[in-house]
UniProtKB/Swiss-Prot annotation:
It comes from Caenorhabditis elegans. It catalyses: 1-O-(1,2-saturated-alkyl)-sn-glycerol + (6R)-L-erythro-5,6,7,8-tetrahydrobiopterin + O2 = a 1-(1-hydroxyalkyl)-sn-glycerol + (6R)-L-erythro-6,7-dihydrobiopterin + H2O. This is Alkylglycerol monooxygenase. It is a multi-pass membrane protein. Residues 130-262 form the Fatty acid hydroxylase domain. The chain crosses the membrane at residues 56-76, 104-124, 366-386, 396-416, 430-450, 452-472. Its EC number is 1.14.16.5. Keywords: Endoplasmic reticulum, Iron, Membrane, Oxidoreductase, Transmembrane, Transmembrane helix.
Length: 505
């Protein structure tokens, strides 16, 4: 008897269920905590390095679900929100879309440097090379992470990760789509002596390890926190309290922060309040991804004070505004660090968070919440298929699917921001999907069951929002007609109503 027959019934016409369950292994669980050895992860070629992000993704779903359940039953439902979590996970999907084969763009630059300019060729099969890379790459991560906070427009490559006003596992996935471009220099420094395959292994696991740092469920971890990064240390990093600003950059190890005086312990009498010093107040994915970079490069240098005077007078100050720390203004002391300038006092000008904390969360109808949550699950399923199959897809297929992801995420943001046009762009999106699947009907697969299922869902979505719009318009017309044509009884009482209104005024 087929042991997975029940799975075939539950996940008919798709292999997604099998793919996820196949990855729920103890080995992948161990990988999620960076519990690996040189002997199981050392390979000669980068082509032999698995996509470890995809391997542990099933466990990430388990962690996310378990955390939400624990927070809910323990009375801490204020530590997560549907709109925030969906926005965060969508950001993670978008960041993966801009990586080739799941590997960071930096690996291609890395190989070029290694092939042409390496100074020393450490043996790829030596455990000592593996161990050296573990520490050296984490130090490079510290430098890169610090740079995207302090080195001017580099902050625009990282802002979205700190834009969440919550701190949970979904926040870990709130990644910038183009951050790898800013971190490439710190990756490529390793290419002068570390073999590409060893670099890539630790690159994967360094990123994977960051996921488990993003939770409020784990308190301090005692002696482990003296050497390793912990959720407590990283909570400080995400805080917008003055004492939290520009602290705790470490990835796996916290020792770099202690060496360079950027370490700060979590204060239980002043717990971190999460988000940005000035929060974004939107769930628009594209805006969250790119606006800070645009603002720093284009607008910051032309900022004026309340009197209308330029805050960055002269060309030099305007240029400094793009490369000096985000909180810098003329007269604020800075000091050089590596290739950028660092604030002498990172908390300069940072206000204390408001009390009580006010989070941006426009009240959405139950219909909107249920619809977006359901659409998100469909998007997530399509994305997992995309991640597993992307190496076999044509450039056209990849482009179309990425466009689908982006437009769908924008629709989610419009619904969560309660934009008047949300329903209209959702109807247009669904029509676009129907046109796409209509074209696919003419290929060799034809009208497959899974295609008909997706088409049916989008037809129902169009009907739902078209009906919703028509009902609203009809209601508005009725209200308008009622105000223009009042009932006879109201006309008879008009003098009395006018008299009351006059007295009130």
């Amino acid at each position: 008897m087929n042991e997975t027959a029940w799975l075939d019934r539950v996940f008919s016409n798709t292999s997604l269920g099998h793919r996820l369950l196949d990855r729920l292994t103890l080995t992948n669980l161990r990988h999620a905590f960076y519990l690996i050895s040189p002997y199981e992860t050392t390979v000669e070629s980068i082509d032999d390095v698995p996509n470890y992000n995809a391997e542990v993704s099933a466990w990430w779903l388990v962690f996310l679900t378990a955390e939400f359940f624990i927070l809910f039953i323990s009375g801490h439902e204020d530590r997560f929100a549907l709109n925030d979590s969906i926005t965060s996970i969508c950001a993670g999907m978008l960041s993966q879309c801009f990586k080739f084969g799941g590997r960071a763009v930096a690996i291609f630059l890395y190989v070029i440097v290694w092939d042409n300019w390496r100074i020393l060729e450490l043996p790829w099969d030596s455990p000592w090379t593996w161990i050296f890379c573990l520490f050296f790459q984490d130090f490079m991560y510290y430098l890169g992470h610090r740079a995207v906070h302090e080195a001017g427009f580099f902050w625009g490559l990282h802002t979205i990760h700190h834009s969440s006003e919550y701190y949970n596992f979904s926040t870990a996935l709130r990644q910038a789509a183009i951050q790898d471009a800013g971190l490439a220099i710190y990756d490529c420094i390793q290419a002068f002596f570390i073999p590409p395959s060893i670099f890539l292994v630790h690159r994967y696991f360094s990123e994977i390890f960051q996921f488990i740092m993003h939770t409020s469920l784990v308190d301090t971890m005692g002696p482990l926190g003296l050497v390793f990064n912990t959720p407590s240390h990283h909570r400080v990093h995400h805080g917008r309290n003055p004492y939290c600003i520009d602290k705790n950059y470490g990835g796996v190890f916290i020792i770099w922060d202690k060496m360079f005086n950027t370490f700060e312990a979590e204060r239980h009498d002043d717990p971190p309040i999460y988000g940005l010093v000035t929060n974004e107040n939107t769930f628009n994915q594209i805006y969250l991804q790119f606006h800070a970079l645009w603002d720093i490069l284009i607008f910051k240098g032309f900022t004026k004070d309340v009197k209308g005077e330029p805050m960055f007078p002269g060309v030099v100050n305007k240029l400094k505004a793009t490369v000096f720390p985000p909180g810098w203004f003329p007269g604020v002391p800075v000091t050089p660090f590596f290739h950028w300038m660092s604030m002498v006092n990172p908390a300069h000008g940072v206000p204390e968070p408001e009390k009580p904390v006010l989070r941006y969360s426009p009240p959405a109808r139950i219909l909107v919440k249920v619809y977006v949550a359901s659409s998100f699950l469909l998007l997530l399923a399509i994305f997992f298929h995309f991640e597993y199959d992307r190496n076999h897809l044509s450039y056209l297929d990849c482009t179309v699917k990425i466009a689908y992801f982006v437009v769908t995420m924008q629709c989610f943001g419009a619904f969560f921001d309660m934009k008047w046009y949300a329903r209209y762009i959702e109807i247009a999106r669904c029509c676009g999907v129907l046109i796409y699947y209509g074209v696919l009907m003419f290929d060799h697969i034809g009208a497959g069951t899974h295609r008909l299922f997706v088409i049916s869902l989008h037809i129902m979505a169009i009907a739902l929002w078209t009906t919703d719009v028509l009902v609203e318009k009809l209601s508005q017309c009725c209200s308008k007609n009622q105000s223009i044509n009042p009932e006879k009884g109201d006309l008879e009482r008009a003098p009395e109503i006018a008299s009351i209104s006059k007295n009130v005024q």
